[in-house]
Every structure is written in C-alpha cells, then in structure tokens.
C-alpha cells in the first residue's frame, strides 16, 4: 500500500475500563503531551534566540551540539524515547539540506565509498562540526548510501533510538510497531509504506516504529543516521539482542492486520531482501 496511506490501523480496544485504568491512561497521555510541549518550546526558543538566527555555518555547529544534547538526555532517561523522536525530527526540520550535504562531506563520501557486493546500503561513519570525540560518546553519526534497489533489511532494535534524515535521492521506507516478542518471532503492526525524499526524517524507538526497512529508489540515495544506544537499560525484552534483530515481515498478516514475523539470521535476510 503506497501513497502515504497506513497499512493498518491500530485495533480498537474493548470499552470496559475501570475508572482507575482510565485515570492512569489520562495521566500518562497528559504527561507525554506536556513533555513534548516542553521540548518543542526549548527547541523553538533555541532556533529563535541562539545560533539559528546567525549565519548557517554557525547553525550547523549548534545543530551538532543539539544532537549531542538530545542523545545525552534520552540516554540519561530525562527525555522519553518517543519525545526524542519528535525532538530530533523538529531539529532536523530547521536545517538547510544543501548546507548539511556540504558540512557532512557527502560528495567526498560518495567518491570514496565502497559498496558491498550484495545490494545492501553502504555505511560510512562521519564526524560532526564543533564536536570532539568525547562529545559524541553514546551515539553514532553515519551516512547510509543506497544504490537503486539496495536496502537495509527489515530489523528491530533493543535499547536504541535512531533517526534517518534523507539528504539526497528517494528512499522507500517501511515501518512497523513492535507489538509482542515471541520465542522465534516478533508480532508487528505495519504503520508506514511510502517513498520519501530530501528533508524527511524517519525515526524509531521501542515505543514507535521499532522495526524499519529501507530501500533505495533513485540511482543514489543518502541518509544521515543518528543511532543512540543504551536507552532504557532497565527494560527487558522477550527477545534479547546485541544489535539488529532481522525479521521477515513478508509473511501473510493475521486477520487483525498484524504480522507474526519470523526472526531470521543476517545471511538469510541478505539472501531474501538484498
């Protein structure tokens, strides 16, 4: 299903709630709403009164510092994972893509990049302006380069948030909420299947779109990824992982629209999707 339409809506829950449950749900919703509003206020204040009002070169430095600050906040538990997603999407939306392409040396990376023999996206670690290595502990800075038809196979993460900002070209993005972990499968619910271009950010966390799958649509597409690890360290998962958990979301969906996606190895994911 394309054109931005959601593949499936969340199922309706039963209407028999106790007043205590309803109160807890309302408090949780209000707390989350206040948290997002507070972070939007902080970001907008920074955009209006700090480096965002200065020449763009200073803007990229402040953008880098804000990325590091957001990573520190979510790792420390002072910012909820879903709030981090909205905050980094808001932050990226303030930047000029052409300037980021220059400051992140995208053209130089494209000249030197070594593509895998399989149709997988190539990955290059990069630096950020105005940041020393000590400033970037706990989060990554990566360029993903996709040839037409190459991909990052579908996978889930534990204890991680990340955001891919498209800098060049077109990328097909398929995302899924992670509903339940089984012994050798993950129950997922499709949320997005669409093609996006420069300026669009795709983020993920445990709470929203934990499973993603990217495929290059144009001859060359480039995304800038900011993964932040060791998030919510006390959380337990039904399926542990040291890194990516590769799955096959192409199996038929259940009657409720959800998919019981088998967990597969990385070589199996490469054979099937690349």
Residue ranges and their predicted role:
Residues 159-177:
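Glycine- and acidic-residue-biased ligand/ion/polar-headgroup-sensing regions
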Residues 143, 161-165, 214:
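His/acidic/aromatic-lined binding-pocket segments of jelly-roll/cupin-type domains
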Residues 163-165, 218-233:
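A short hydrophobic beta-strand segment most commonly corresponding to one strand
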Residues 118-148:
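A short glycine-rich, His/Asp/Glu-containing loop-to-beta-strand
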Residues 43-85:
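C-terminal segment of N-terminal export signals and the immediately downstream linker at the start
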Residues 12-40:
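N-terminal secretory signal peptides and thylakoid transit peptides that target proteins
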Residues 180-209:
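Short acidic-glycine-tyrosine-enriched beta hairpin
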Residues 142-157, 206-209:
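Conserved short histidine dyad/triad with adjacent acidic residue
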């Amino acid at each position: 299903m394309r054109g931005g339409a959601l593949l499936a809506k969340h199922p309706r829950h039963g209407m028999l709630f106790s007043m205590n449950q309803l109160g807890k749900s309302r408090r949780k919703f209000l707390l989350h709403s206040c948290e997002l509003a507070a972070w939007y206020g902080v970001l907008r204040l920074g955009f209006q009164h700090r480096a965002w009002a200065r020449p763009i070169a200073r803007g990229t430095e402040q953008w880098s510092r804000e990325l590091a600050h957001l990573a520190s906040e979510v790792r420390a538990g002072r910012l909820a994972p879903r709030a981090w997603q909205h905050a980094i999407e808001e932050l990226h939306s303030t930047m000029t893509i052409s300037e980021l392409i220059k400051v992140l040396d995208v053209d130089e990376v494209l000249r030197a990049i070594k593509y895998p023999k399989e149709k997988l996206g190539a990955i290059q670690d990069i630096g950020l302006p105005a940041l020393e290595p000590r400033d970037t502990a706990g989060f990554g800075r990566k360029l993903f380069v996709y040839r037409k038809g190459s991909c990052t196979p579908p996978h889930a993460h534990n204890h991680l948030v990340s955001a891919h900002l498209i800098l060049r070209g077109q990328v097909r993005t398929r995302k899924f909420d992670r509903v339940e972990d089984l012994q050798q499968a993950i129950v997922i619910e499709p949320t997005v299947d669409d093609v996006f271009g420069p300026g669009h950010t795709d983020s993920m966390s445990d709470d929203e779109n934990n499973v993603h799958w990217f495929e290059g649509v144009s001859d060359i597409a480039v995304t800038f990824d900011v993964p932040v690890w060791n998030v919510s360290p006390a959380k337990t998962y039904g399926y542990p992982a040291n890194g990516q958990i590769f799955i096959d979301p192409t199996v038929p969906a259940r009657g409720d629209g959800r998919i019981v996606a088998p967990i597969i190895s990385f070589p199996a994911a490469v054979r099937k999707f690349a």
